[in-house]
């Protein structure tokens, strides 16, 4: 940052507020006062899990989701970074089921195994959706630079190789895993771009370019607490 390597990013005054936000999703779940709102029972394992890893089963679940988000908003007044991942779980869960029903594939079972792993370990997962897009008047396959949308570069027996980027990824640096999803509806000609997958944050070939926040250097100034505003919590994003 500013041309210097940061060895202790956990306590860095620009970076720490973002870490504190996602940490709140864990600490409140351990607090008996908020435990009922912050946790749920997994329909896959029957275990108590963080609500951010839950697949909604009822209207009560949906209401509790909103109440949980309001609570965290009151506690942090900032983005707590697990909402898109939670929505991604629910979207991919139902979509993979419908795909398997139609095409006889096994994506749903694959995803359930991954979700159980996430639930058992209470992982933070970044929902990575927004592509750079390039020329927005053109479909992905018509882009001059095909890497403006995440795409399958190579298909192998053991999986796929992908290229591209996701932008404006709030909290991705604080996430254990990423779920990559298409950013828009795709046609047949865009089939290489119609891909969704999960990968760990330390996967080989995955890079994150740290994105700072407006006026974040104010946190470095002496006596800034006079008008700093939200000193303990804040945001960050990355180009992934």
Regions found by a protein language model. Give the residues of each.
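Acidic, aromatic-enriched beta-alpha/helix-loop junctions
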Residues: 20-35, 192-198
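FAD-binding core of flavoproteins
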Residues: 127, 132-240
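Short active-site-adjacent helix-start/loop capping segments
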Residues: 8-9, 45-47, 135-138
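Generic structural signal for well-ordered, non-transmembrane alpha-helical segments
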Residues: 16, 20, 116-119, 161
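Internal helix-loop-helix
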Residues: 27-125, 177
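N-terminal-proximal low-complexity accessory segments that begin disordered
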Residues: 1-26
